[in-house]
């Protein structure tokens, strides 16, 4: 979902209280994105409008109540293997020192399922499909990394780790959770969860091909 704010900042450098409240409420409710339209396209204060939106988002997400509300909103039905995998990924991330959840996704469905769980760590969506990457660009908590098609599990683990490192979510001493599907490169096959070190030497010495 995308939250759309009012248009007061088309002509003024500050929003009304109602507009700030609308933006904050959208974020508290777990909106994937908050959107400006005329304020940035034709308004007199486009930079101020963007900065105001950013400030409100940062303030809301730093509120301890925000996580409580987000966690209380988890009520989706879980009927598939993929549902169970992403739920487990979120629980592992919340109970251990995990820095990110990396998921391989062709259609974008797995990334959306993880975003629905609203984990406390960043989501890194690994995909070889540019259209999928574009669709996921506004998804809650998700950053997309383009990745070539994978044929082997170890190759997929290494690529996911490199994606988390390149985005600054983890260092070599950290761990991430990886979800994927075997056989690779086929939509709807998410069936693997792996907790992986971000040290490639350890991966090559421990992981199967």
Which residues are covered by each model-predicted region?
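Glycine-rich phosphate-binding active-site loops on the catalytic face of alpha/beta enzymes
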Residues: 22-46
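C-terminal binding/interaction regions
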Residues: 162, 171-184, 189-202
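Long, charged amphipathic helices and adjacent flexible linkers at domain junctions
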Residues: 53-90, 206-209
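C-terminal helical cap(s) of enzyme catalytic domains, especially alpha/beta-barrels
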Residues: 40-63, 192-195
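Nucleotide-binding motor/catalytic cores of P-loop/tubulin-like NTPases across gene-expression machines
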Residues: 110-112, 118-155
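Flexible, glycine/charged-enriched surface loops at secondary-structure junctions
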Residues: 37-38, 43, 62-73, 99, ...
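Phosphate-interacting basic helix/loop segments used at nucleotide- and nucleic-acid interfaces
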Residues: 84-98, 157-168, 174
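Single conserved hydrophobic/aromatic residue that forms the stacking wall/gate
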Residues: 1-6, 10-11
């Amino acid at each position: 979902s995308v939250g759309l704010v009012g248009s007061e900042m088309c002509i003024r450098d500050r929003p009304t209280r109602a507009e700030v409240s609308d933006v904050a409420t959208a974020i508290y409710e777990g909106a994937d994105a908050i959107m400006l339209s005329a304020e940035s396209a034709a308004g007199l204060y486009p930079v101020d409008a963007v900065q105001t939106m950013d400030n409100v988002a940062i303030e809301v997400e730093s509120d301890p109540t925000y996580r409580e509300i987000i966690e209380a909103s988890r009520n989706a039905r879980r009927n598939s293997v993929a549902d169970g995998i992403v739920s487990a990924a979120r629980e592992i991330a919340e109970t251990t020192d995990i820095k990110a959840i990396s998921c391989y996704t062709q259609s974008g469905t797995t990334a959306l399922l993880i975003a629905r769980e609203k984990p406390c760590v960043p989501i890194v969506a690994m995909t070889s499909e540019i259209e999928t990457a574009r669709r996921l660009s506004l998804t809650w908590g998700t950053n997309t990394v383009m990745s070539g098609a994978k044929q082997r599990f170890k190759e997929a683990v290494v690529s996911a780790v490199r994606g988390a490192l390149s985005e600054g979510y983890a260092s070599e001493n950290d761990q991430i959770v990886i979800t994927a599907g075997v056989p690779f490169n086929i939509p709807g096959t998410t069936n693997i969860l792996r907790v992986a070190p971000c040290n490639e030497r350890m991966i090559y010495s421990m992981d199967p091909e």
